[in-house]
Amino acid sequence: MAITAQMVKELREKTGAGMMDCKKALTETNGDMEKAIDFLREKGIAKAAKKADRIAAEGLTFIETNGNDALILELNSETDFVAKNEGFQALIKELAAHLLANKPANVEEAMTQTIEGGKTVEEHINEAIAKIGEKLTLRRFEIVSKTDADAFGAYLHMGGRIGVLTVLEGSTDEAAAKDVAMHIAAVNPKYIDRDAVTAEEVEHERQVLTQQALNEGKPEKIVAKMVEGRLGKFFEEICLLDQAFVKNPDMKVRQFVESKGGTLKGFVRYAVGEGIEKREDNFAEEVMNQVKGSN
């Protein structure tokens, strides 16, 4: 398989490794990106890749709560100029209120529901597109429920570039639930705790760490012990309750939650545009296109 400059660039972005190392890794693994990451890690060249998806598309996240129900959604636009537009911000609030009140199962069902004036949600969004002049997309949403004995934690970072919704069970301390949401926004854990990590993922990490230790020339008799120690650090990176609490690093998130008399039932974290590839236009051209379009 031909190794392209774009593939090398992507691997460099994901691992921080040098260009020649990335090219060699891709060549050795026949262009398989995931295997190339493992190859670099096993050689000790790259740290554990936080396979963060490239954040590209624009828009906002938004959170709406009403009693024991809460909703988090993401509405995309083509540019961040539009995301700051009053019409866009009014639309996201209207959609949030509708979705929380009507609880559709998914985006497809939501688009067919009737909103104000007998229009469908899809028609309502299309009207906003006609006024604003950009493609707008209701990308995703999630509705979460709790009891009177629980608390929601809602946090929007940078005006909605990242949105996090948490549920603290057995405690009505909304401030604590929000503090956990702020931690999640900053650190981006993949799981609540170790039990949520699949056996396959743990075994894969164990194999990579074992090969890494052997390549470092460590004696086989101490490799297993080293690997278990490094696995602990792996869990700290991806499991929320194992992480040092951002607001008090001397305490784990688990200890903070327990000190409030609750348990963390779940969380949802949206970052605008994660996983969406954006057309890489020249920025000056993008601005000129907008100026021309406004004439």
UniProtKB/Swiss-Prot annotation:
Keywords annotated in UniProt: Cytoplasm, Elongation factor, Protein biosynthesis
Membrane found in the keyword field: no
Region Involved in Mg(2+) ion dislocation from EF-Tu: start-end pairs: 79-82
Domain of life: Bacteria
A Pfam match: EF_TS
Record InterPro entries: EF-Ts_dimer_sf, Transl_elong_EFTs/EF1B, Transl_elong_EFTs/EF1B_dimer, Transl_elong_Ts_CS, UBA-like_sf
UniProt subcellular location: Cytoplasm
GO molecular function: translation elongation factor activity
One GO CC annotation: cytoplasm
NCBIfam families documented for this protein: tsf
Recorded family membership: Belongs to the EF-Ts family.
Protein purpose: Associates with the EF-Tu.GDP complex and induces the exchange of GDP to GTP. It remains bound to the aminoacyl-tRNA.EF-Tu.GTP complex up to the GTP hydrolysis stage on the ribosome.
Listed PANTHER family: ELONGATION FACTOR TS, ELONGATION FACTOR TS, MITOCHONDRIAL
Protein known as: Elongation factor Ts
